[in-house]
Amino acid sequence: VGRVTRAAAAPADPWSDDAPAIAGRREFEQVGDGERYVLTLQDVPIEFEAAHLRRVRDDLHAQVTVRCALSGARVYQDTLTVSTENLSSASHRFRFARVLEHQSRAPQIDWTRLFDEFAIRVLTAEAAGRPSVLLSDIPDRLDDGYHDVLGVKLATHGISGFYAKGDSGKSVFTLFVLGELAKRGIPVAMLDYEWEGLPHKKRAAQLWPDGQQPPIRYIQCTRPLREEAESIRRDFLHHGIRYFAIDSVVPACHDSPNLPDTVIAFNRAARYVAGTQAGQLWVGHVVKNKEIADGDETFFGSVFWGNLIRAGWFIKAQPSIEGGPLICAYHHRKRNGLPQQPSVGIAIHFEIGRIRITRCDLADSAPDLAAGLPLWQRM
């Protein structure tokens, strides 16, 4: 939304219903799937924006930004004020309108009616929701809906997951996956909640030592995903990102990962970032319980982590012998819309100035890991 242009306040007879602020042209826009709403007055330089919408005890709250270019208004960079407001409450709206009147130094403008109109438009749009469509009208995709990297299949538009104990090579293989997708012409990005950019840059140089590093966009995240989702989404839309990884999910949470509400909020933020154009990979750790049987491993925290992913891979690593590769078994644990995939052996070779990642035969390279393969794959 462009910035409003500074202009004079409304002319004569400002109190009537014919005043420009009341009777003038306006444009109301819903951004995305209701992530933001914007009301722009065409004849008076005023704009309302509501973002970060959420329900609190059935009332709709939002961060409201009011931009104004009226002469004499108390603004900072065209912003009159920013405040979290209860759009469902008439008394709260009235109080906020008084703030707008004071800051704008324009008592001739009926701020109460303007803000009421904006709130009612937002409430109506939220109540309308998304219209239904016929399943038969949903467009088909040209591919099978999965990326394949060394036999590990990941949903192109849904949520995939890697989960394992520490020191299982999750992060380096995640970087490798992003690079391989980038080499196929798919714009990719990493959201890093554990480390910083320079180590990943050095790893990328070792993974692709020929100097032809694939383009991987990188964001070092310091706040919970739900708080950074808006800025990340704008960046991803600007760069056309079609696949991204979150490494790792627990530091990206706003509250305990054991709580269903935390996972649901995380999922909503991640889906908002992805929009309709991008697939995503969640990287996490497993529950630290030695009594868990093979095949029952899951993300650390609430069961909702495993329930929400569409393609899930549990990683089990065998400690490398000095000078040897790190051997990892990727076991296909979640398979919505995808037939059961065989477990995949991945060898990570840490060499001088280089990291090589190859597929390997677990029976030959790591018999102990091969013993954990499903019976049908060992026959």
Regions found by a protein language model. Give the residues of each.
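Phosphate-binding/switch region of NTP-binding enzymes
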Residues: 161-163, 167, 171, 264-356
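Short, flexible loop segments at the rims of nucleotide/cofactor-binding pockets, characterized by
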Residues: 138-140, 220-223, 257-259, 289-293
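C-terminal regions of RecA-like/P-loop NTPase motor modules
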Residues: 1-61, 72-73, 237-238, 275, ...
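The Walker A/P-loop phosphate-binding site
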Residues: 38, 116-211
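Conserved catalytic network of the ASCE P-loop NTPase/AAA+ motor domain
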Residues: 154, 181-184, 208-212, 235-238, ...
